[in-house]
Amino acid sequence: MMKLTTRCGSAAVDGLNEALLAKAAEAKLLRTNRVRADTTVVPANVAYPTDSGLLATAVRRIGTTAKRIQAAGGARRTTLRDRSRAAGKRAHAIAAKLRSGAALGADQTRAAVLNRTGELAGLAEAAAREAERLLANARQAVRRAKAKAAELAARGEHDAAAGRRRGRLVRAVNDLAKLLTATRQIVAQTRQRVHGHTPDGASRRVSLHDGDARPIAKGRLGKPVEFGQKAQVVDNDDGIVLDHSVEQGNPPDAPQLAPAVKRVIKRAGRTPRSVTADRGYGEAKVDQQLTELGVKHVVIPRKGKPSQARRAKEHRKAFRRTIKWRTGAEGRISYLNRGYGWDRTRIDGLAGTRIWTGHGVLAHNLVKISALAA
């Protein structure tokens, strides 16, 4: 089922969502008098990333992937030293230093941790360097295997066992190539941190298998930083999700609202009377864009200190009543998290997250619309 889901891609599930909303609009079940928007983080399927943990895992996976290549008949005479034990020892030493930080003092503990982390980066670099040679030889083996298969096909023959072995070899070679790219990136950002520089969060790698996941600081208690993709949800009075989108990293909220409302207008065939969102969207440009789209009431608190006129507007009874209704967007996101898989994507990458969240929205809207139609 997972292979079928990823093969169809996000376009298929997007089409299903569009068809469902179109059917609801045709049956006059899609209310757009009031709509609200909010953003959330869809966590990637990754453990909490640390430089030492990522490096130790990279060293171990390089060794296991190399063994897969050699077991499939590639680069059998190329030697690759297994550094996983040495990497594990250094990772455990870092954990021990952090546990004994109170006894050693903060400065001494930090120096010891950075020293061990630098050693781990060196081990990962050495493992990647050796694996590059093995990868080059394995690619030659793949070319030879494909040439042999072509010769057999020209004679009208077929070796099923060799084909399966070749498939395993190709998959292992591709996995090692991706792993080495990720390892080099993690080594580079670890070197930055060891030298006192903080890696750029927009490009920082936090996983070996999910290259699109990014650190996102939302300022939540208990979860100040989450790792995954940022999603926006737009729903109405009935709780139907009228629009959703997933973006990489932590883009600003404000520029996402007007395009979402445009899509809602296209689906419903009419303009929402009132649009509300939290203070993260509070910019004069957003109000102007929504007004130009035909929205009569834009109910979004402004960032910073408001002027006296703006303060008076935000204290009106209708404004405050709509703002109270807006808080239900957080409940909608919580409902998606608890019941429809938004608490963690099980498909890697940005495209995978879009597929996963799209299926969640489809199931959610089917329940809501069927209840309205009953």
Segment roles from a protein language model:
Residues M2-A374:
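Anion-binding and metal-coordination hotspots
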